[in-house]
Amino acid sequence: MTKRIFFSIIHLLDCFFRNMFFIKGEVGGSKMAGLDQKKTPVLDAIKRYVDENVVQFHVPGHKKGKGIPEFAEYVGKRVLQMDANGMDDLDYANNPTGAIYEAEKLLAHAYHAESAYFLVNGTTAGVQAMIMSACEPGDRIILPRNAHKSTIGGIILSGAVPVYIQPEINEEIGISMGITEESLKSAIKENPHAKAVFLTNPTYYGITSDLKSLVRIAHRHEMAVLVDEAHGAHMSFHGDFPLTAMEVGADMSSASMHKTGGSLTQSSVLLVRSNMIATEKVKQVLNLTYTSSASYILMASLDIARK
């Protein structure tokens, strides 16, 4: 009990001081102060690569569209010239140190996170990475019954044990609602040693819960909070929207930038702001599940959409 009280005090102080720097409409944070959100490092690197007209002795095999002329004629040569492979001038998605590294810093800054990662396999990849980062085989994870199928995939891959919360049903309009404080407290009481709480916010019907209260409840019991924000990529950018996972102190979230943020289909983001989940663990999981041939077209679209 003493340990939990101490943990709760530390968490509340941590959230207070962090939120002094993370205010909706004033994106920032002392660690990333001064970042210019007008910059597009990945897109700029690709522009330089295309302008230099590099002779390709590397993949992809279509060679700037020469190998698929019918497709090139339809979509245009420029997009196929942008379809490049990892190299020093363009950076490497699996271990970024250049343009992608700078772009991901800007992304974290924009989303009020401590770190952020480009995803080219949708929020499905982000959801699975969150669960695998937070849970070991046998760990219990509390989640809503109406979670996306990617959540079930993450549970299978991690070996975690699901504990389901049945969301309330609005009989008038016939849809499931969000998770309530009471239902979460009940699930935690029955599973006090659960490792994480997984939430969908907003739901796929656009329903939002009192995320701030749910995060506070979970953290009070030393449980990490993971949030599927697939349909909430836009919510960080206007004060009239509900608070996001990063803004209320959740540990990780994944958002489909392609759904409501303007990037190309399949491109999403993974966001981390946690004292409970090590960044190195997240990187290890991503390196296990992430392609070694990330699309620069998709990453450039994330870069420009964030701007």
Give the location of each predicted region:
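Conserved PLP-enzyme active-site core in the AAT-like
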Residues: 34, 39-47, 51-53, 71-74, ...
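His/Asp/Glu-rich, glycine-adjacent segments
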Residues: 5
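Conserved N-terminal alpha-helix of the aminotransferase class I/II PLP-enzyme fold
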Residues: 80-122
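N-terminal "arm"/small-domain region of PLP-dependent enzymes with the aminotransferase-like
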Residues: 28-97
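Short, positively charged and aromatic/hydrophobic N-terminal segments
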Residues: 9, 16-24, 31
